[in-house]
């Protein structure tokens, strides 16, 4: 078993162990397109997009971008909170197989089919595995800067993220402090000097409990701001799982649908080994290179949104029968 480092010992004890759950009910936001292909027709896609965030992200991380994607593709976009993130419940385990089962259950609950996945970082691996395991559900995907391989080198980054978040916990910043967000960011600087990373980690920080949200890992009654992640559990539960990949169980699996990979040229996440495995698992892949590090969504927001919209629109156009109106099988006239 992995031993936590000394720095990770917070002044507050872990409240309770997390429950074990095969699937969880995922919180989500639905972004509907405001524009149509023709002003007199209600034309939308019957192929919904599911946007899967990165580690310590949430459905709110790139809500603005998701609205742009909805309008740009004329498609509903579901942004989800993975387990142990945002307003979705806390549970173990936190491995890729389990996260894919959560995606499957989510789609079943909301009657989604022919889904198009957009996954970033952690979400990219979840999306790749979902495509390989659930080809009957997934039509196509955009994978942002990750590869289907084990990546043990990212464990050190994960530990730094957790250290910085625990430092906020130890700072005991009051929920009534009007400057709580800035003070939290300052508290994180010791272990996380990168302001962009801090901003993304802070998306899960709240000064009041979300309505209906319960967790055995968070004490909302202590008067302090709280992360919506069970951060005191995350090193033992998540560090090695996030860097992992189910090599043996995916051996020989291929996804025959179109997949667009957006690669950061300054990022180490898609190595030569990763490139090889991408070609093995996703034979219909295309690459788009961005002059960016791993944080493509922050460094090149307009560019990556355009790539997603262009890719999905082209795929929809290519698959549409010649006699149908692009966008929906039966467009309804507005009255």
Curated annotation (Swiss-Prot):
It comes from the Eukaryota. GO terms for cellular component: mitochondrion. It is found in: Mitochondrion. Disulfide bonds: none annotated. The keyword Mitochondrion applies. Its EC number is 2.3.1.268, 3.1.2.1, 3.1.1.-. Keywords: Hydrolase, Mitochondrion, Transferase. One of its GO terms (molecular function) is transferase activity. The active site is at 121 (charge relay system), 145 (charge relay system), 294 (charge relay system). The keyword Acyltransferase does not apply. It catalyses: ethanol + acetyl-CoA = ethyl acetate + CoA; acetyl-CoA + H2O = acetate + CoA + H(+); ethyl acetate + H2O = ethanol + acetate + H(+). Its main location: mitochondrion. Residues 48-300 form the AB hydrolase-1 domain. InterPro entries: AB_hydrolase_1, AB_hydrolase_fold. Pfam families: Abhydrolase_1. Alcohol acetyltransferase that catalyzes the synthesis of ethyl acetate from ethanol and acetyl-CoA. Can also function as a thioesterase by hydrolyzing acetyl-CoA in the absence of ethanol, as well as esterase hydrolyzing ethyl acetate. Belongs to the AB hydrolase superfamily. This is Ethanol acetyltransferase 1. It comes from Cyberlindnera fabianii (Yeast). The lineage of its organism: Eukaryota, Fungi, Dikarya, Ascomycota, Saccharomycotina.
